[in-house]
Amino acid sequence: GVHYTQVLDFVRGISFHRGIQCDGVFTHFATADEPSGWDYKLQCQRFTEAVQAIKDAGFECGIVHCANTPSSMLDSSMHFDMIRAGIGLYGLQPCELSGRVMQLDPVMSVHARVTRVAHPAMGEGVGYGFTYRVPRTRVQICTLPIGYADGLSRTLSNRMDVLYRGERVRQVGNICMDQFMVAIQSNPAHEIPEAEYGDEMIIVGRDGDAEITMDEMA
């Protein structure tokens, strides 16, 4: 990036290179979720003045853009030639304020199919470090082929749920590089059918009335 005070010198410098063409000028907001704040307004002012200085000097700016999801929803003055919606494309609100302006519906879901089922004995450990041990009999452990190499944070180990047949079932053991395990535990008051190889489970999304959102995962 180029500091706003050096933009014009930078553009003048590259103008002497025949192999370089300016296709666009942009910035990325640090505090777009606070459009009434001083920092946001100052960054808007600096960017606008830098763009105008380039134009006044006779140079082409190309496509001017800076509005991310919150800025595109909350401040139309910063739309310029295009907007850069990121998290909003997934139907997720970037901040509380944007939720008052526009309703967004989540459109992304993550599914996986069971690759292994097991019925370990009571007291047996599951996963690296045995951070989960089977507490009793009639616990089914299912393996799903997603891990931290796929973006599933290892910090969620033993803390997240997945959906199976409209029910929440607990992830157990440490999340591995390319797989993790869940435990299906039934009791007389609440019976959950055991899973089979190839059954689908939902990591993010909706199944009947049950839902796991990206906000929950975060």
Residue ranges and their predicted role:
Residues 1-121:
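Active-site loop/helix belt of alpha/beta enzymes
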Residues 119-218:
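C-terminal accessory subdomain/extension
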